[in-house]
Amino acid sequence: RVAGIVNLVLRNGHVVHYEATGKRGSENEMAMEVDVLFRIYSMTKPVTSVAAMQLYEQGKFQLSDPVTKFVPELKDLKVLNEDGQFEPVKQVMTMHQLLMHTAGMSYGFNAQNDLVDQLYLRADLSSAANLDEFVVRLAKLPLRSQPGERYHYSVAVDVTGLIVERISGQRLDEYIKEHILEPLEMNDTFFEVPEDKRDRFTQNHFINPETGTLVNSDYAPAPYGYRKGVALSDFFDVTLFAGGAGLVFTAMDYARFAEMLRRGGELDGVRILGPKTIKFMTRNHLAEDSMH
């Protein structure tokens, strides 16, 4: 079912198991190594959220702030309700809702059965040249629910990445590198894989549901929710820094990030976030009846 795996287990901050097994891809006979670079997709989201919360700690925004304070492009959004009718937004979309995936946005993963997701898929957000163009396209799409009404996994963290850019005055990749990756010595984490490290970059795969075999999706048509016939993302010449899905990392690098969170925002004497902020971030912010 998989070509290769890197297993890394930490207990109380100490490595107790670290092993690579298998090969690097369905079309790559090279042995898997512990320093291989993987696309981490949605594991990018906590990194972007930490970047945003650093700015929150500095007083650069409040969780009650309207998203339109930083992204005015979203001021005229409509909601496509379950009856297929457009209705006005009833309350302001807040930064807190954006970080909780309760802002009413979507992703396009259920395009076969959902009209809003079909519109997301047609908008082809991932082909935008940069985050500014991304949000211009997003602004033309309807919300699937009223802000704050329910949880739905979405592109909200990509919008958060744009807000990090606009508040900090830095590109998202530059901000994350300076304020998170370099302080934590995460030297193998990138939005764009350096040329001298591309030999460690793994192939991307999905499982063919009809045959149960691995398919290299760098070349094959992609599953639902992505553009057909192209790689899921380009990690060699990046201009769209996707805060929700854009990073590449090694297992050890992400372990350092996770250990920083476990220790309350600090690792090896370097503080990334305050312990109260970490405690706030890791509590349950969703009511049970909103988990739809």
Q: Where on the chain are the PLM-derived regions?
A:
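Short clusters of small/polar residues that mark proteolytic maturation junctions
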Residues: 20-22, 66, 219
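Short, surface-exposed loop or secondary-structure junction motifs
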Residues: 77-292
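Active/ligand-binding-proximal structured segments within catalytic/core domains
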Residues: 48
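Short, conserved catalytic-motif segment at the N-terminal edge
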Residues: 1-40, 60-62, 76-82
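PAS-family sensory domains
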Residues: 67-68, 92
